[in-house]
């Protein structure tokens, strides 16, 4: 006491209060009581006017918080404190009956009440006993499930506020409920009762609180149960707040307390009706972290789940915790308010809940027809597992799909309840199956078939399917030729792949978006939505066979119906591609076109035409199986089936919004498909490639690949089959899209692919005509449309189409087509250029097989170069393997592997003249877009007067050669590459260019005449040649294309550096290539010869490309290049093939002076392709495979290519690579084909080149080739190479067909180029960029050069642009840069080559890159959205 006295004066409130509490250790006291003790015992000197109570209260508040606090605020009471060290005792007492551990609220309430009642200032002891008594009395309450508040927990002011709010609410409730409820009207002391009751209710309802929470959180979504829960939860909260309320109540006795507890049990807080006290309570005050923490753990966890993720934290123990601001933010506040309002509106009354539920049921009803398509996640119905779906979705184009799959189940409940029923209830696979079953049988079958194709896509099933497909396809390629085999195969695949296909198909159907690529693949099979779905399934595996069979049957039919079928097909195909890309809507469009056929197609599908049906199911397949075939490609998606031809109809005509949309869709789809299709392509490559055999047949297996192509290419193939007899022309006339492919199939009229091969010369004229000649002079306009259509369908399709177009030229081409189709998505396509190679190898080979009638061709001939079988298989396998990582892997693998394969294809080509076609097809496919453009060339030509990207032209061309270039409109050829490179390239490529020009002219004419005769072709070629030589100045265009490339990389420099050093380099590269391609060894010489001529070949179509390829083979590699190659190949092989190609690119033809030259060119083309490949090899990354494939051919051409392409490749590696790859493939094949033809030797122009048989010293060859190319280039350049060449050179193509060759491709390329331009390198698969370089003939040049055409020689310059066009699919895959855009553009261009580029009237404006696709267009065109028209349409 002495110490106390001494310190009394200086003692703080905290010390005084501590002293008091120490004296009465087990007696919690309120601040008033403490003050009384202090005053009584004089523990602190209290001066007057200091408001001691306030000071003490503030001190207690402060010191009861935090770890440092010396006081412990008793939880349930208003202001009752005890010393922290005494807490254990107090807690013990409190926890009598586990009060503390029991509901902290109830505990605090009772204690609070007691303290309040004892407030009167009873002595501490009384207080203590009272407290104890309370504790015991509340003890029952403590029994409540809610967790205890830890001893350290103190009620915070917020809690106090909530208590106040509760108090008020309770008063009202008390009044209201005194009458209503069994609660006796308790006197005011009853307040306490109420509070207890409430507490009890709260504790009872605690479990419900989660629901309450939920109710609050879920804005009115919660049903009555939730509401009741929420009401309970609020009651719980109320309980918390109530705890403090008791304070007011008067002293109560133990029995009162007990009675209270009992009453509370039956008393409940109304949380349903508007009478609820909660309506007038601020829920935010009732619900806070303190009241929340009082709830039982399980309730807290359940309630936390109702909160947004941001408002809950997951602790290290995995338990969720309340975020600091979770219950204290505007969202929770508004939710609480909203819940209160809904409560007051009676929304939670049982009657209302019932009504609401009924409404939801009504709303959520999905139309039955929709229900069968519903999938909780993409691909569910097709049997994809959620993981697979996510993978597919993730890599392809549909992130949302990926996301949705997981999320969908949640969202599904309301709108997708029915579906969910199926999906959730049943296992996913079951669900899928269910859904499939739900769908019409046809649909189911279709699904299956699609699934089959899809397996390629789906990672898990992919390998199996692809293996199965491969084996089936391979084994069935020949067998499939006969319907019986087909059926067997079909059945087999169907059984094995049925489930997968079903699932996949569903997936495809459900998520068209998801993997449009996939869709591409699937679409073919899927397209056979009709009853013949099963067959469609087989189609993928045995699709080639069935298609082939179909093709054979229809071939005859085609001959008769080819014009109409083709037309129908091309339209359908074109439409179909869009359908698949556009997804269902496009299908509808297609439907319109195809409705007449639709019913019939299904039947057809049922029949053995299934494969065709795949392509044409929506088409009037009945008209001819060929029709169905076109559908097949078109059939990218099951939906496409009916509407397969919607877009197509326009393709040839004016560019309608639908066309634009279709194009955009295609591009978009291609992008998505790039990945999906890349995977699919890979799978298709493996499985699809084999299917490759026939544009139609190949499609079966390649349905995945070609099926995708099917949309664009397959239809063509099928169409070709349909128009097998002369569909080429027809195709050209028809629609490039389907037409192109049709053209190819035309070749294989006899059999889809087999026939192609079988009738390479015979059909090739048509095929070429159709494929390449889709650009045939006669059909150019249509082809333009055709090309456009093809473009529109999808880059892949286009490429496929192109490939297919080429296919007719050569069976291999068909394969390539298939392969491209595999690349169907742009991916494959882009890759296809290179994948085309692979496709060619694996696909082309198959084509060979088809052509030869033996799968062997596929492995054997194809394998010629690398290892046909291995290559083919590898390619196919790789694609399959790649499938999992659709885009990249596929692209890379497909490209690399496929490229080599294409070489193989090339090699094979020699084996069979068709095989060269195969190689060409790759190139052709690349070129095809160009060709398409070329065809459109005339269309575009009008617009080619001024460079579309003047600034680019100026900058890229560096203004030296700009005059020409500037003049050139370079329609989308962003590549107005530097002119400078042109020079170097020009020099070395001059000769080639000249030759190319000549060849191109000749080729062009030959393209027209190709169908007629080699001789005629020669004449035409010569005529054209003479014509085109003047076009040589077109080099500018070439340059422009090249520029494109350069712009990506230092193509210019490369080209510039081409000079001797580069040439030497190239020579060495060529030598390497030659060595590599010893098989092609023989070809290499000719290839080299062709390489010179190649430029011409490139110019032509193929030849032009080669020349370009040689000088700037890379450039020539562009879409056109492929075409050119094809042309050349055809030419070399038989003027027919070439002619066809030329036909496709009549303008290109000029390149080939004569059949011999054509042959030479063809060979050169082959070589060029090889060279390009080599060049690519330099850009190995980009076009490794292509390099291989193109090796021998490339060897010679490579020097130039190495120089130009090498650098160009490097710069536009991906583009170049792809282009080269394709070109190379085509070239190789061509070369081979040509070699076999031996025509190349005949090529006088490229005479100095080597006979195809010759295996000159690699260096010599390369040197000769370069020299020849240079000479030609010089001439051409002199004439126009200088202007054109720069472009070409710039492009990568170098001199290539800067003039003509470039022109033609440019036509198509313009669109592509820009895309490519943006990211040539990025777009490894976009080798098409090179195609870009290839100049098409005058016509093409004109058309193509809207932006980059010199002036008079529209065709010449244009070629370059085309390059990009081919790239679309790949580029789509390579979203990396412009490549992606290119697909759109390419498509657009191809699709509506009609002048997408040429239609742009702001050539002089600055060009900017589209953010969506990477395509380049004018600032005015793109506008503030920074999106091109295609992207805008798609969006």
UniProtKB/Swiss-Prot annotation:
The lineage of its organism: Eukaryota, Metazoa, Chordata, Craniata, Vertebrata. Residues 182-195, 451-463, 506-527, 593-603, 750-770, 815-827, 864-875, 926-935, 1013-1029, 1200-1225 have a biased composition (Polar residues). It comes from Homo sapiens. Signal peptide: none annotated. The keyword Membrane does not apply. This is Putative Polycomb group protein ASXL2. A motif (LXXLL motif 2) lies at residues 887-891. GO terms for molecular function: chromatin binding; DNA binding; peroxisome proliferator activated receptor binding; zinc ion binding. A zinc finger (PHD-type) spans 1397-1434. The record marks 20-21 as: Breakpoint for translocation to form KAT6A-ASXL2 protein. The keyword Cytoplasm does not apply. It is found in: Nucleus. Belongs to the Asx family. Residues 91-235, 388-415, 433-463, 492-604, 690-795, 815-836, 858-878, 906-935, 997-1032, 1166-1225 are annotated as: Disordered. A motif (Nuclear localization signal) lies at residues 174-178. GO terms for cellular component: nucleoplasm; PR-DUB complex. The modification Phosphoserine is found at residues 146, 524, 562, 571, 600, 637, 648, 1319. A motif (LXXLL motif 1) lies at residues 303-307. Putative Polycomb group (PcG) protein. PcG proteins act by forming multiprotein complexes, which are required to maintain the transcriptionally repressive state of homeotic genes throughout development. PcG proteins are not required to initiate repression, but to maintain it during later stages of development. They probably act via methylation of histones, rendering chromatin heritably changed in its expressibility. Involved in transcriptional regulation mediated by ligand-bound nuclear hormone receptors, such as peroxisome proliferator-activated receptor gamma (PPARG). It comes from the Eukaryota. The modification Asymmetric dimethylarginine is found at residue 641. Residues 103-121, 136-146, 167-181, 906-925 have a biased composition (Low complexity).
């Amino acid at each position: 006491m002495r110490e106390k006295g001494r310190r009394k004066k200086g003692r703080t409130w905290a010390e005084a209060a501590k002293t008091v509490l120490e004296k009465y250790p087990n007696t919690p006291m309120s601040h008033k009581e403490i003050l009384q003790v202090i005053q009584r015992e004089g523990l602190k000197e209290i001066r007057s006017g200091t408001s001691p109570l306030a000071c003490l209260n503030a001190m207690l508040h402060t010191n009861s918080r935090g770890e440092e606090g010396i006081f412990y605020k008793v939880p349930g009471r208003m202001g009752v404190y005890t010393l922290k060290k005494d807490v254990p005792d107090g807690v013990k007492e409190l926890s009598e009956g586990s009060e503390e551990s029991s509901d902290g609220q109830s505990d605090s309430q009772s204690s609070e009440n007691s303290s309040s009642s004892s407030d009167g200032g009873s002595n501490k002891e009384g207080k203590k006993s009272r407290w104890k008594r309370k504790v015991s009395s509340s003890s029952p309450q403590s029994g409540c499930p809610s967790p205890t508040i830890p001893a350290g927990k103190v009620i915070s002011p917020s809690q106090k506020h909530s208590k106040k709010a509760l108090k008020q609410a309770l008063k009202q409730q008390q009044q209201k409920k005194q009458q209503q409820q069994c609660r006796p009207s308790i006197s005011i002391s009853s307040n306490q009762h109420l509070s207890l009751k409430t507490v009890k209710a709260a504790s009872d309802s605690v479990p419900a609180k989660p629901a309450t929470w939920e109710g609050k959180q879920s804005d009115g979504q919660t049903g009555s149960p939730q509401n009741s829960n929420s009401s309970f939860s609020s009651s719980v909260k109320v309980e918390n707040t109530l705890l403090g309320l008791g304070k007011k109540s008067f002293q109560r006795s133990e029995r009162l307390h007990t009675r209270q507890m009992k009453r509370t049990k039956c008393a409940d807080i109304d949380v349903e009706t508007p009478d609820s006290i909660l309506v007038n309570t601020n829920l935010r005050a009732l619900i806070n972290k303190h009241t929340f923490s009082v709830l039982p753990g399980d309730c807290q966890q359940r309630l936390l789940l109702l909160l947004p993720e941001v408002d809950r934290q997951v602790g290290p123990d995995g338990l969720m915790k309340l975020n600091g601001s979770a219950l204290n933010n505007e969202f929770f506040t508004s939710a609480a308010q909203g819940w209160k309002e809904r409560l007051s509106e009676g929304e939670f009354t049982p009657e209302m809940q019932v009504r609401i539920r009924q409404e939801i049921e009504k709303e959520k009803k999905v139309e039955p027809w929709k229900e069968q398509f519903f999938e909780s996640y993409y691909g569910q119905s097709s049997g994809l597992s959620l993981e697979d779906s996510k993978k597919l979705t993730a890599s392809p184009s549909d992130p949302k799909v990926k996301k949705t799959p997981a999320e969908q189940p949640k969202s599904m409940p309301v709108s997708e309840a029915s579906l969910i029923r199926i999906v959730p209830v049943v296992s996913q696979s079951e669900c899928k199956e269910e859904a499939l079953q739900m769908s019409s049988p046809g649909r189911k079958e279709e699904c299956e078939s699609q699934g089959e194709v899809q397996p390629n896509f789906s990672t898990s099933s992919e390998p199996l399917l692809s293996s199965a497909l491969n084996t089936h396809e391979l084994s069935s390629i020949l067998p499939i030729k006969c319907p019986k085999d087909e059926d067997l195969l079909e059945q087999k695949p169907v059984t094995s792949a049925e489930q997968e296909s079903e699932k996949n198909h569903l997936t495809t159907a459900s998520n068209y978006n998801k993997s449009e690529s996939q869709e591409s693949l699937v679409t073919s099979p899927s397209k056979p939505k009709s009853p013949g779905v099963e067959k469609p399934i087989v189609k993928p595996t045995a699709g080639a066979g069935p298609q082939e069979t179909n093709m054979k049957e229809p071939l005859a039919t085609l001959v008769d119906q080819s014009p109409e079928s083709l037309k129908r097909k091309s339209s359908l195909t074109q439409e179909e591609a869009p359908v698949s890309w556009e997804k269902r809507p496009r299908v509808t469009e297609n439907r319109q076109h195809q409705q007449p056929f639709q019913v019939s197609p299904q039947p057809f599908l049922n029949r053995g035409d299934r494969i065709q049906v795949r392509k044409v199911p929506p088409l009037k397949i009945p008209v001819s199986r060929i029709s169905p075939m076109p559908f097949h490609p078109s059939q990218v998606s099951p939906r496409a089936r009916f509407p397969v031809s919607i877009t197509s109809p326009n393709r040839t005509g004016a560019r309608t919004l639908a066309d634009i949309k279709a194009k955009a869709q295609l591009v978009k789809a291609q992008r998505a498909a790039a990945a999906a299709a890349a995977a699919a392509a890979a799978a298709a490559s493996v499985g699809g490639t084999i299917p490759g055999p026939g544009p139609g047949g190949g499609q079966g297996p390649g349905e995945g690949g070609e099926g995708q192509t099917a949309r664009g290419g397959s239809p063509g193939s099928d169409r070709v089959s349909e128009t097998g007899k002369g569909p080429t022309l027809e195709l050209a006339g028809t629609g490039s899209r389907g037409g192109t492919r049709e053209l190819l199939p035309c070749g294989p009229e006899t059999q889809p692919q087999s026939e192609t091969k079988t009738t390479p010369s015979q059909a090739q004229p048509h095929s070429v005509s159709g494929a390449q000649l889709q650009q045939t002079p006669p059909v150019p306009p249509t082809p333009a449309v055709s090309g456009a259509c093809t473009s529109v369908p999808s880059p892949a399709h286009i490429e496929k189409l192109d490939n297919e177009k080429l296919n007719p030229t050569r069976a291999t081409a068909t394969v390539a087509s298939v392969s491209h189709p595999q690349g169907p998505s742009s991916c494959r396509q882009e890759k296809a250029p290179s994948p085309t190679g692979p496709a060619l190898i694996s696909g082309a080979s198959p084509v060979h097989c088809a052509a030869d009638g033996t799968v062997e061709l596929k492995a054997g001939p194809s394998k010629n170069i690398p290892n046909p079988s291995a290559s083919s298989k590898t390619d196919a396998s790789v694609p399959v393997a790649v499938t999992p990582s659709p885009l990249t892997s596929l692209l890379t693998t497909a490209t690399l592997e496929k490229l080599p394969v294409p070489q193989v294809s090339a090699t094979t080509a020699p084996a069979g003249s068709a095989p060269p076609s195969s190689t060409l097809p790759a190139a052709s496919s690349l070129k095809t877009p160009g060709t398409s453009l070329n065809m459109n060339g005339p269309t575009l030509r009008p617009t080619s007067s001024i460079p579309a990207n003047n600034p680019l032209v100026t900058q890229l061309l560096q203004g030296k050669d700009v005059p020409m270039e500037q003049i050139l409109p370079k329609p989308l050829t962003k590549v107005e590459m530097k002119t400078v490179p042109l020079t170097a390239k020009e020099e070395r490529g001059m000769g080639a260019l000249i030759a190319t020009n000549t060849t191109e002219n000749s080729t062009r004419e030959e393209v027209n005449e190709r169908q007629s005769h080699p001789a005629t072709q020669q004449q035409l070629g010569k005529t054209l040649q003479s014509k085109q030589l003047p076009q040589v100045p077109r080099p500018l265009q070439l340059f422009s294309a090249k520029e494109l490339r350069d712009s990506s990389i230092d193509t210019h420099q490369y080209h510039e550096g081409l000079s001797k050093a580069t040439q030497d380099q190239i020579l060495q590269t060529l030598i390497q290539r030659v060595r590599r391609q010893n098989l092609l060894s023989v070809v290499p010489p000719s290839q080299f010869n062709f390489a010179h001529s190649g430029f011409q070949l490139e110019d032509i179509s193929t030849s032009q490309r080669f020349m370009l390829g040689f000088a700037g083979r890379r450039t020539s590699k562009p879409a056109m290049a492929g075409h050119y190659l094809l042309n050349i190949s055809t030419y070399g092989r038989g003027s027919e093939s070439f002619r066809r190609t030329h036909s496709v690119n009549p303008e290109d033809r000029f390149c080939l002076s004569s059949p011999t030259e054509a042959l030479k060119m063809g060979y050169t083309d082959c070589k060029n392709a090889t060279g390009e490949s080599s060049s690519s090899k330099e850009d190995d990354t980009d076009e490794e495979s292509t390099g291989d494939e193109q090796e021998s051919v490339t060897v010679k051409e490579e020097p130039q290519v190495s120089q130009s392409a090498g650098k160009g490749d490097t710069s536009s590696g991906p583009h170049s690579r792809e282009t080269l790859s394709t070109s190379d493939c085509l070239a190789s094949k061509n070369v081979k084909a040509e070699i076999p033809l031996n025509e190349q030797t005949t090529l006088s122009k490229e005479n100095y080149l080597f006979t195809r048989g010759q295996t000159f010293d690699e260096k010599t060859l390369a040197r000769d080739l370069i020299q020849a190319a240079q000479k030609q280039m010089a001439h051409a350049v002199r004439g126009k190479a200088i202007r054109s060449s720069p472009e070409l050179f710039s492009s990568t193509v170098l001199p290539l067909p800067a003039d003509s060759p470039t022109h033609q491709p440019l036509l198509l390329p313009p669109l592509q180029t820009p895309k490519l331009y943006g990211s040539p390198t990025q777009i490894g698969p976009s080798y098409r960029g090179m195609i870009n370089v290839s100049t098409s003939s005058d016509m093409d040049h004109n058309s193509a050069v809207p932006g980059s055409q010199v002036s008079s020689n529209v065709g010449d310059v244009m070629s370059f642009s085309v390059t990009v066009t081919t790239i679309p699919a790949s580029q789509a895959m390579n979203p990396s840069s412009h490549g992606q855009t290119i697909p759109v553009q390419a498509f657009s261009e191809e699709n509506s080559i009609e002048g997408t580029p040429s239609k742009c009237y702001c050539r002089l404006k600055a060009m900017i890159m589209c953010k969506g696709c990477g395509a380049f267009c004018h600032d005015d065109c793109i506008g503030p959205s920074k999106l091109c028209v295609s992207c805008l349409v798609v969006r």
